[in-house]
């Protein structure tokens, strides 16, 4: 993916941050609201850029924000909320 949509990235970051705990891939997809092929593109992009970390919870793969992802959340999502007053992410 050459140019990701920053609003979609913000939805990923917001979903993982607001969850407060690691999430399964399916739950992330449902909360972000993308079809599977598009979700996979963004998911892989986020992982490749170090915004997520993978964990294990009772034998299931779960994902949460990495420290870099938390920083990106604070910068991008906060900027969107401040700039687009009241816009739902």
Predicted regions and their residues:
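A short, conserved structural fragment
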Residues: 47-57
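Basic, amphipathic "hinge/linker" alpha-helix immediately C-terminal to the N-terminal HTH DNA-binding motif
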Residues: 59-76
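Amphipathic alpha-helical dimerization/coiled-coil segments
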Residues: 74-89
């Amino acid at each position: 993916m050459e140019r990701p949509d920053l609003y979609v990235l913000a939805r990923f970051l917001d979903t993982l941050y607001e969850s407060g705990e690691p999430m399964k891939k399916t739950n992330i997809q449902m909360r972000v609201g993308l079809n599977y092929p598009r979700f996979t593109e963004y998911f892989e992009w986020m992982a490749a850029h170090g915004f997520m970390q993978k964990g294990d919870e009772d034998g299931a793969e779960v994902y949460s924000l990495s420290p870099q992802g938390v920083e990106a959340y604070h910068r991008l999502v906060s900027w969107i909320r401040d700039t687009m007053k009241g816009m739902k992410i």
